[in-house]
């Protein structure tokens, strides 16, 4: 669980997302409250429930990006789902309980990686011994079993030194490695994924773990052996217990496109499952117990963050019970020309930085001038206003169109410097931007 303060979390998010300070503050406080709750006495800790968040804002302003970055900062079980993928029980589609099952699977994977990392030093020692056993087989007694000697031989110690110094990395050896289990593909109807997973696990267990001889270089063998030995040191039952505890105490679920499951008054019949999805979500958000293949998981203290554009609906179109379980509301502002300029320059992996790096691989030096960036931002904003407002995603379309000629002829521009200034942008984009019909279909 991350111990970063809200201010540190916001500062970290600022490196990737421009503006939207209120949304960043809300998720930062919610994440910090997870840590604060764990410092309380157990009796009071159980009573403190997470304050779920509803993020409201037009498409392309950073709602999903905040979730992606939060997942990396949280160091906790995290899953992002699309509300449109789910239907109520009885309809074709995934049931909402699969959210918690997927979250638990993610937690098991996360805890397993942490356990392997903790056991890495011991695993490296065991892997080293297995490689040395191949290079210098131990002496055997009359019954064909390895003799137990107190001190390793000088030859073994010499090879150990060479192995650690990397002198034997390119030497090939034949060693027994765990064979990958035979995959069993099972075609199941939508909504039956859990049964499919259980059947695949059953077949995998029936097959057992087999050893297969492979001839590979020592450097690669060490990597594979370390992973194999580290996996053996992990206790599966203890791993499941830790994963379930991590989900129950620190789990975060991000539900995107929640506005798409709002019931619309003018639509009936085909719209019937929308409200059903909301009602199925209620127990999860309020707190219930979900059965997973790893065990029973309580959702009482899982943090839910929902987001939606709400362009053809409003948050009040959600059923009242679900509205009440999303008490913190954050509105994200539409992006301005100034925001577009900042998006093109401020983030650590901004679009301009990406294009400069991509063209550098062909030996082409690209520079973006201030007036060029300003004109790109104005063009993106203008197209958004005239056609459909898709927020910052419009910059991808505009820049790709702008860089098309350079990308196509990059090999011929090797060793040259190209400056993307206002005149260059005018020449390549003005005709498209000024013609609304062309903008609609090309940009």
From Swiss-Prot:
Location (main, coarse): cytoplasm
Region (Disordered): 139-160
GO cellular component, one term: HslUV protease complex
Transmembrane segments: none
Alphabetized UniProt keyword annotations: ATP-binding, Chaperone, Cytoplasm, Nucleotide-binding, Stress response
Signal peptide: none
Oligomer status and interactors: A double ring-shaped homohexamer of HslV is capped on each side by a ring-shaped HslU homohexamer. The assembly of the HslU/HslV complex is dependent on binding of ATP.
Alphabetical list of PANTHER family matching this protein: ATP-DEPENDENT CLP PROTEASE ATP-BINDING SUBUNIT CLPX-LIKE, MITOCHONDRIAL-RELATED, ATP-DEPENDENT PROTEASE ATPASE SUBUNIT HSLU
Protein family per UniProt: Belongs to the ClpX chaperone family. HslU subfamily.
Protein name: ATP-dependent protease ATPase subunit HslU
Species whose genome carries this gene: Sodalis glossinidius (strain morsitans)
Taxonomic lineage from the root: Bacteria, Pseudomonadati, Pseudomonadota, Gammaproteobacteria, Enterobacterales
Gene for this chain: hslU
